[in-house]
């Protein structure tokens, strides 16, 4: 009989949910994926499957809406590859066109590990909580059933977080 991953057990026990006296409990969050910026999704997916057995990858060109980048309307398109890797997903991201937070990352670091994806059950509240801590939304958008926002916490944690909330498509 297999057990739930440790992070899932901890979330069920309330670990990771902060509570201050007189304040409502924070929303539930858990790591869902690791995002990697790549030059070519198909090639990166092939190599990961061939070299270390992660895959198969599902390749998508999501149709995003209400895009923002640096607080302004955004116009960009990406191709992504998704595969299970144990309890989390690997998300490969290839820029097809437009200006994104991935561009500045590539200019500074080259291709590679970019962000931690964090699933939340209330993205609006999660974003408000992060903004109250001084973090800002760098890029955001949605598609049917999913809303997402990238927050830069690079100076404080060395990481970029992608908060996302998945709802049943209406």
Name every feature range the model reports, one short phrase each.
Residues 21, 31-33, 39, 53-54:
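The feature marks the first
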Residues 106-128, 132:
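Short, solvent-exposed interaction modules
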Residues 27-28, 41:
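Onset of an N-terminal alpha helix
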Residues 31-38, 48, 80, 85, ...:
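Short, structured motif recognition centered on aromatic/hydrophobic residues
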Residues 42-54, 126-132:
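Amphipathic alpha-helical segments
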Residues 38-42, 120-123:
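Helix N-cap motif at beta-to-alpha junctions
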Residues 2-27, 36, 55-86, 92-114, 124-170, ...:
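Vicinal oxygen chelate
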């Amino acid at each position: 009989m297999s057990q739930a991953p440790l992070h899932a057990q901890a979330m069920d026990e309330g670990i990771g949910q902060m509570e201050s006296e007189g304040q409502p409990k924070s929303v539930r969050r858990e790591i869902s994926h690791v995002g990697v910026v790549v030059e070519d999704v198909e090639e990166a997916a092939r190599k990961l499957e061939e070299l270390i057995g992660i895959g198969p990858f599902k390749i998508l060109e999501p149709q995003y809406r209400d895009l923002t980048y640096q607080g302004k309307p955004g116009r960009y398109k990406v191709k992504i590859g998704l595969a299970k890797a144990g309890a989390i997903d690997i998300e490969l991201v290839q820029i097809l066109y437009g200006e994104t937070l991935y561009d500045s990352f590539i200019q500074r670091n080259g291709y590679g590990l970019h962000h931690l994806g964090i699933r939340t059950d209330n993205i609006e509240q999660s974003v408000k909580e992060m903004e109250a801590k001084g973090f800002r939304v760098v890029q955001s958008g949605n598609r049917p059933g999913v809303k997402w926002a990238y927050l830069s916490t690079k100076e404080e944690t060395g990481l970029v977080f992608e908060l996302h909330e998945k709802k049943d498509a209406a």
